[in-house]
């Protein structure tokens, strides 16, 4: 009986740890990408210049807002 209870508790502890680890890592990554977006305004300006567009502040801010909205 003691062995069965010990195995059961170990399995439950592993499952709880896996779920907690998943949600903890997910929250950390969301916070990280919010603070450090994968693309910056300078990168957008360079990309628009390479495509032959004249990067105005309005266009750059529109693209940044679209990217922030997609991350949510």
Curated annotation (Swiss-Prot):
Q: Where in the cell is it found?
A: Cell membrane
| Top-rank lineage group of the source organism | Bacteria
What are the protein's UniProt keywords?
Cell membrane, Membrane, Transmembrane, Transmembrane helix
Disulphide-bonded residues = none
Annotated GO CC locations: plasma membrane
Q: Does the keyword Hydrolase apply?
A: no
TM regions (residue ranges): 3-23
Q: Which Pfam families match?
A: UPF0154
| Bilayer topology term | Single-pass membrane protein
Principal localization reads membrane
Q: Which family does it belong to?
A: Belongs to the UPF0154 family.
- Designated name of the protein: UPF0154 protein lhv_1362
Native organism: Lactobacillus helveticus (strain DPC 4571)
